[in-house]
A protein has these predicted regions:
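Bacterial Sec-dependent N-terminal signal peptides
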Residues: 1-24
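Glycan-recognition and catalytic cores of secretory/periplasmic carbohydrate-active enzymes
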Residues: 20-406
Length: 406
C-alpha cells in the first residue's frame, strides 16, 4: 500500500505542474536522444547472458528504472513496437548494428503469419515490425510475411456487420457478439498495403467497409469516439458503444481519439475519398480544442481530478505523428495549423517534463495504458516511444522538403 500511495504522490505531483511545460524542438537533437536511449536499452537487454530476442520491452513503471519485457506471443499486442523502434532508429542512424538487432527481434514475430488470428492486433504486431523492415530493406521474405498476415487478419471480418472482430476472446465473457475497438483503425493500414502490393484486392474493400461502419456507428454526435462498438451478428446493427479503457461510456478516452485521428488519416491517404478528410478534421478538432496548455492530453478528457489527473504521452505522440501527415493533405491555413500543433506536442514531449533522460532507457515518461484495470498508469510504455520517433522522422522529412510518408 505504501508503494501505491507513493506512486500516486508522484503522479499527482507531476500533473499539477505539467501544464506549465514549454520548450523548443531541434528534431535532430531529439532523434539523437532516441538513438542514445535505444543503445542504452540494447545494452540493458543484453545483460550478462545475451539478448533473448523473443522478449520485447513493454513498460517501465513510475518507480522502476529498467524495461519490463514480455514474450512475443499472439496475445502480447505490443510485441511489434520494439522492433519498429529499432527500424526507425536504423532509418535515422544507418547503424548496421541497429539493423542487425532490428532483424533479429523482427524474426521473433514471423510465426504470426502461420497461425490463426487471435485478435485484430496483427497490424500492430506485424506491420510495425515487418512493415518497416520491408520499407527499409525490400527483403522479399518480409513482404510475404505481411501478405500472409493480412490474409489472416481478414478472417476476422464479418460481412454482415461490415467490420473486423477485434476481440474474439470477449464475445462470450462480456456478451459482445461482434466487437470492434477504435485501435483497430490502425490495423487497416496493413490491409491497404497488402491489397496494392500483390495481395487480394478484397483486402482494400474490407478496410473501406470497416472505416465506413466505424465512422457511422462508433462516434457520438460531437465526433468524440467510443472505444468499443458492440454489434448484433444477425442484423449487423449497433447494440451499444462502450469506452472500455476510458473513464466512462460517455467520455472521450484520449488514446482512443488518437487512434481515430491516425486511422482516418491513413484511410484518406489510401482512398483519397474527401468524405474521410472532412470527417477526419471534425474528429481532430474536438480533440485539439479540449487539450491542456502543453498539448499533452489527460488520459481521458473527463478524467476525475483534472488538472491533477495523469497525462497520456502516448496519445500525444500518436496524434503528433498523424497531424504531420494530415497537414500535407489540407490547404495552407488548416494544414499549417495542424503542423504547428504537432510541433507543439513534440516540443512538450521533448521537454524534461516528459523525457526519461538518465532515469530510464525509454524515450518518454507519463503514459497511461488502462486506468480502469489499474494497469500501466503513469508509465513509460513502448508504443509511446514508437509513435514519438515516428513523428520525429516525419517532421524531419517535412523540414527537408521530402514526402512525410517514405
Amino acid at each position: 500500500m505504501k508503494k501505491i500511495v507513493a506512486g500516486l504522490v508522484v503522479v499527482l505531483g507531476f500533473c499539477a505542474c505539467a501544464h506549465r511545460t514549454s520548450g523548443t524542438l531541434d528534431v535532430n537533437k531529439a532523434l539523437d536522444y532516441c538513438a542514445e536511449q535505444t543503445q542504452r536499452s540494447l545494452v540493458e537487454l543484453k545483460g550478462d547472458s545475451g539478448i533473448d530476442y523473443t522478449m520485447m520491452p513493454r513498460n517501465i513503471m513510475t518507480d522502476e528504472h529498467h524495461w519490463n519485457c514480455r514474450k512475443a506471443t499472439k496475445e502480447e499486442w505490443c510485441a511489434g513496437f520494439w522492433p519498429g523502434v529499432l527500424w526507425y532508429d536504423y532509418e535515422y542512424t544507418q547503424d548496421k548494428h541497429i539493423l542487425e538487432e532490428a532483424e533479429k527481434f523482427t524474426a521473433s514475430l514471423e510465426f504470426l503469419s502461420r497461425i490463426p488470428a487471435y485478435d485484430h492486433d496483427l497490424g500492430f504486431l506485424v506491420f510495425c515490425s515487418y512493415g518497416n523492415g520491408y520499407r527499409l530493406t525490400k527483403n522479399p521474405a518480409y513482404k510475404q510475411v505481411i501478405l500472409d498476415t493480412a490474409d489472416t487478419l481478414a478472417t476476422l471480418f464479418n460481412p454482415i456487420v461490415g467490420t473486423i472482430l477485434s476481440w474474439p476472446r470477449e464475445v462470450e465473457p462480456r456478451n459482445w457478439p461482434h466487437n470492434t475497438i477504435m485501435d483497430n483503425m490502425i490495423n487497416l493500414e496493413m490491409l491497404f498495403w497488402a491489397a496494392k502490393n500483390g495481395g487480394n484486392p478484397y483486402l482494400y474493400d474490407i478496410a473501406v467497409s470497416h472505416a465506413d461502419k466505424t465512422m457511422k456507428c462508433q462516434f457520438r454526435p460531437d465526433y468524440t469516439s467510443y472505444h468499443v462498438a458492440v454489434y448484433d451478428t444477425i442484423t449487423g446493427n449497433l447494440i451499444k458503444g462502450v469506452t472500455h479503457q476510458g473513464y466512462a461510456d460517455s467520455t472521450m478516452w484520449a488514446r482512443g481519439q488518437a487512434w481515430a485521428i491516425y486511422g482516418y488519416t491513413v484511410v484518406y491517404r489510401e482512398t483519397k475519398d474527401p468524405k474521410y478528410l472532412d470527417f477526419e478534421q471534425k474528429v481532430t478538432e474536438v480533440y485539439l480544442e479540449r487539450l491542456p496548455e502543453d498539448k499533452v492530453p489527460y488520459w481521458d478528457f473527463s478524467a476525475p481530478g483534472i488538472p491533477d489527473a495523469p497525462r497520456d504521452a502516448s496519445a500525444a505522440a500518436v496524434v503528433a505523428s498523424a497531424l504531420l501527415e494530415l497537414s500535407t493533405y489540407l490547404p495552407n491555413g488548416t494544414g499549417k495549423r495542424y503542423k504547428d500543433a504537432a510541433i507543439e506536442m513534440l516540443a512538450s514531449l521533448n521537454s524534461d517534463s516528459y523525457q526519461s533522460g538518465k532515469s530510464k532507457p525509454s524515450f518518454l515518461l507519463h503514459s497511461v495504458g488502462h486506468w480502469p484495470a489499474h494497469s500501466e498508469i503513469d508509465a513509460s510504455i513502448i508504443y509511446a516511444d514508437y509513435y514519438y520517433i515516428e513523428a520525429l522522422l516525419r517532421l524531419k522529412r517535412l523540414q527537408e522538403g521530402k514526402n512525410v510518408i517514405k
